């Protein structure tokens, strides 16, 4: 009788007959032959054939399954077609395993092939000869061990105050050299902050004699990552457990109006990019082009010329060869060089390839635009008006360039600062490269995202209890990252630890909707987004409040908006919606809150490599419906969508893709998540190649009216090289009638999102 099974990697696991049954049933569904009862009977035959083996291998079991399918007959039915489907699937899995082995990766988490390719190129540790020396699970263990060990410091602080050790404490005999380095550095941070007593040697004696809960949290952190329920940002995955030790994804650096300040910032940028971080800047302090330079009596070259220097530096660094550097460049709308800035990424100029650019706009700009008024272009050095220009002229230039090149986007500065919980520290003038994280000068933030596709149970409901557990674990993890971090610049350490911002976000939202059988472009989808994100935001706040009771409030809490409301928080912000481009590949889910880009598409990653992807949920659905075929997959791959494919209309609605969705639905979804997000939302408003400038203007204005903090559009094929390509053929644009109907149907709750009721404003009493 079978008791255990030997897996391909040699590990032994308990035998589960149901796995055989489901494998057979899935093959039956793909050819529309057989029932669950048939599958159960065939599985019984497989088990009977193996009755003399107590511990067969996976390969042995699969060989018997093939033979049973080829030779069995039930009620006159034969299953040779099912056997063929099973054999083809088995062969496909074998080819994938072989390709993973050729990459030198031992995949102990059964990740997708694309995930393994990304891990092999960027994340898994290698020796001096370039040979991979860890598995994906070991990578997550490395990260968990680096982050979780700082729990020991808080156990020590508590012990010094109360004389108690945690109930789950375990004595640590010896920590690794890397863990000791993390502890020594974090101990120093806490000593500077005045929250820890004694010497480092006394602390080490404590964990080796009294014990710590660090082991418990290390295991929990590893579990939540290895299950792909939660994945932290790329620098944490790449640098945790290494000498580099820099764990944050996003930074904002100030750019002062002097050569000394500019090149000090450039040096800091290089250090950040070397460690895998991205940087955001406002160049609005720089004197305009042709302004006088006091020291030489010459003329200034202006912000755009200095941006080019930052761009070239980024290109040279290439973040240690692991990923391309990224920058956000912002210039306020009333800077004298605003028109040059807006045109700086025109295809004719071909500069700033390592920059996203956005115009910083305020409520005053939109007032002038609505009243057809003039904007005063003010020299930031002298504060004098250099020129007056119609707001409409600036707006038209922004829209025209966004249509041509997808840049610039908009950053709504007043909206950001209305929701700034630490006004006592300063105003926010910039964001990280993708726009989701508004930050103070010298501030950094570490991000991580929950894979929502993992929380749909029974095909119809969301497991909020398990989601709550993950939110609390992830919030604790991200707070620990701040202490485990090795900051590239002293000032960044100071500001980051002062505000302790963290950014918990989501990915796999489109997958969640598909599993729930809800179209992305529907009011029901907006309601799900609202329900899920409000839950995550509330629970992350509760988790941060619990950490504040346990560890203390963030230092800048005193005088903050949180203190005014009497709410003790460990972190000034807790939620951010990041784009999750790479970590969603690792997790095997859809990106961020984006719809599916295509059901079949080519993804350009890793310096020119291409990954061909077919959506696994679509493949699963077609097999379930018994309509899967290679011919159908090839047909879908022509455009990446189902618009011209003869298939069930309900399936078409559920598997709607980004370019089939009217831009207004994209903006509505961004606004819905923004209402329940402390920081910002990175979302691309995808448009078809034949979208008009009016479409872009409508989306930009809608984002402002719905209290988004920024907006980026992308008209298909508006860049010469784009990250995602869907199929090879064009699809027709929805009729204008659909757009008109959409606007007519829009309920007040989404048209009139008042900032005083926005949960992204922590107190609910933000100034208008």
From Swiss-Prot:
Its cofactor is adenosylcob(III)alamin. GO terms for molecular function: ATP binding; cobalamin binding; ribonucleoside-diphosphate reductase activity, thioredoxin disulfide as acceptor. Signal peptide: none annotated. The active site is at 432 (proton acceptor), 434 (cysteine radical intermediate), 436 (proton acceptor). GO terms for biological process: deoxyribonucleotide biosynthetic process; DNA biosynthetic process. Monomer. It comes from the Archaea. This is Vitamin B12-dependent ribonucleoside-diphosphate reductase. Belongs to the ribonucleoside diphosphate reductase class-2 family. It is an enzyme of class 1 (oxidoreductase). Pfam families: ATP-cone (PF03477), Ribonuc_red_lgC (PF02867), Ribonuc_red_lgN (PF00317). PROSITE patterns: ATP_CONE. The lineage of its organism: Archaea, Methanobacteriati, Thermoplasmatota, Thermoplasmata, Thermoplasmatales. Disulfide bonds join 250-445. It catalyses: a 2'-deoxyribonucleoside 5'-diphosphate + [thioredoxin]-disulfide + H2O = a ribonucleoside 5'-diphosphate + [thioredoxin]-dithiol. It comes from Thermoplasma acidophilum (strain ATCC 25905 / DSM 1728 / JCM 9062 / NBRC 15155 / AMRC-C165). 5'-deoxyadenosylcobalamine (coenzyme B12). Keywords: ATP-binding, Cobalamin, Cobalt, Deoxyribonucleotide synthesis, Disulfide bond, DNA synthesis, Nucleotide-binding, Oxidoreductase. Provides the precursors necessary for DNA synthesis. Catalyzes the biosynthesis of deoxyribonucleotides from the corresponding ribonucleotides. Coiled coil: none annotated. Substrate binds at residues 234, 249-250, 278, 432-436, 579-583. Its EC number is 1.17.4.1. Residues 3-97 form the ATP-cone domain.
């Amino acid at each position: 009788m079978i008791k255990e099974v030997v897996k391909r990697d040699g590990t032994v696991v308990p035998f589960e007959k149901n796995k055989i049954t489901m494998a057979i049933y899935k093959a039956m569904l793909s050819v529309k032959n057989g029932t669950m009862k048939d599958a159960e009977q065939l599985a019984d035959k497989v088990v009977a054939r193996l009755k003399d083996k107590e511990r067969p291998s996976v390969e042995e079991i699969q060989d018997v399954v093939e033979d049973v399918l080829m030779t069995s007959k039930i009620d006159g039915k034969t299953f040779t077609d099912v056997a063929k489907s099973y054999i083809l699937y088995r062969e496909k899995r074998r080819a994938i395993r072989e390709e993973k082995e050729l990459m030198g990766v031992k995949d102990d988490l059964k990740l997708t092939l694309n995930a393994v390719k990304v891990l092999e190129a960027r994340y898994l540790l290698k020796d001096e000869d370039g040979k991979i020396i860890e598995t994906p699970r070991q990578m997550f263990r490395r990260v968990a061990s680096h982050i979780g060990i700082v729990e020991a410091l808080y156990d020590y602080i508590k012990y010094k105050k109360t004389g108690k050790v945690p109930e789950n404490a375990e004595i640590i005999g010896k920590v690794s050299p890397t863990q000791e380095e993390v502890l020594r550095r974090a101990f120093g941070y806490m000593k500077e902050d005045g929250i820890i007593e004694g010497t480092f040697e006394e602390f080490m004696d404590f964990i080796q004699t009294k014990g710590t809960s660090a082991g418990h949290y290390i295991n929990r952190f590893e579990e939540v990552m290895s299950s792909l329920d939660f994945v932290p940002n790329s620098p944490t995955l790449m640098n945790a457990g290494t000498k580099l030790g820099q764990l944050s994804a996003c930074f904002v650096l100030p750019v002062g109006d002097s050569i000394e300040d500019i090149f000090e910032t450039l040096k800091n940028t290089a250090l950040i990019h070397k460690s895998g971080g991205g940087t955001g800047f406002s160049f609005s302090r720089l004197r305009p082009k042709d302004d006088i330079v006091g020291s030489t009596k010459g003329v200034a070259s202006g912000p755009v010329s200095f941006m080019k220097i930052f761009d070239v530096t980024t290109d040279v660094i290439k973040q240690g060869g692991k990923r391309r550097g990224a920058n956000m460049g912002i210039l306020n709308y009333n800077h004298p060089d605003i028109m040059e800035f807006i045109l700086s990424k025109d295809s004719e100029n071909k500069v700033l390839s390592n920059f996203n650019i956005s115009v910083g706009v305020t409520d005053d700009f939109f007032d002038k635009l609505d009243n057809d008024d003039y904007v005063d272009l003010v020299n930031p050095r002298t504060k004098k008006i250099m020129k007056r220009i119609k707001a409409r002229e600036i707006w038209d230039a922004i829209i025209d360039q966004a249509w041509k090149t997808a840049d610039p986007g908009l950053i709504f500065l007043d909206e950001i600062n209305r929701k700034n919980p630490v006004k006592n520290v300063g105003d926010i003038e910039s964001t990280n490269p993708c726009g989701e994280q508004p930050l103070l000068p010298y501030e950094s933030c570490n991000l991580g995202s929950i894979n929502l596709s993992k929380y749909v149970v029974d095909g119809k409901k969301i497991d909020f209890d398990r989601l709550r557990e993950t939110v609390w674990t992830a919030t604790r993890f991200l707070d620990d990252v701040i202490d485990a971090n090795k900051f590239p610049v002293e000032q960044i350490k100071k500001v980051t630890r002062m505000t302790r911002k963290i950014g918990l976000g989501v990915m796999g939202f489109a997958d969640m909707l598909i599993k729930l059988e809800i179209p992305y472009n529907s009011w029901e989808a907006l309601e799900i987004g609202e329900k899920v994100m409000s839950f995550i935001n509330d629970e992350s706040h509760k988790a941060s409040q619990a950490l504040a009771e346990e560890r203390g409030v963030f230092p800048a809490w005193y005088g903050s908006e949180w203190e005014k409301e009497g709410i003790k928080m460990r972190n000034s912000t807790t939620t951010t919606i990041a784009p999750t481009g790479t970590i969603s590949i690792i997790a095997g889910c859809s990106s961020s809150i984006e719809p599916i880009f295509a059901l079949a598409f080519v993804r350009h990653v890793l310096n020119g490599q291409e990954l061909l992807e077919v959506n696994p949920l679509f493949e699963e659905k077609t097999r379930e419906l018994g309509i899967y075929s290679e011919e159908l997959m090839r047909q879908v791959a022509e455009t990446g969508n189902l618009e011209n494919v003869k298939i069930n209309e309900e399936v078409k609605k559920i598997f709607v893709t980004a370019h089939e969705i009217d831009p207004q639905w994209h903006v509505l979804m961004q606004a819905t998540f923004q209402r329940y997000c402390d920081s910002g939302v990175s979302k691309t408003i995808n448009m078809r190649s034949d979208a008009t400038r009016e479409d872009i203007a409508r989306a930009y204005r809608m984002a402002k009216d719905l209290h988004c903090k920024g907006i980026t559009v992308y008209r298909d094929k508006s860049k010469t090289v784009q990250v995602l390509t869907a199929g090879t053929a064009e699809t027709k644009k929805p009729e204008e009638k659909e757009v008109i109907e959409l606007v007519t149907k829009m309920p007040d709750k989404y048209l009139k999102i008042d900032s005083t009721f926005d949960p992204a404003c922590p107190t609910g009493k933000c100034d208008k």
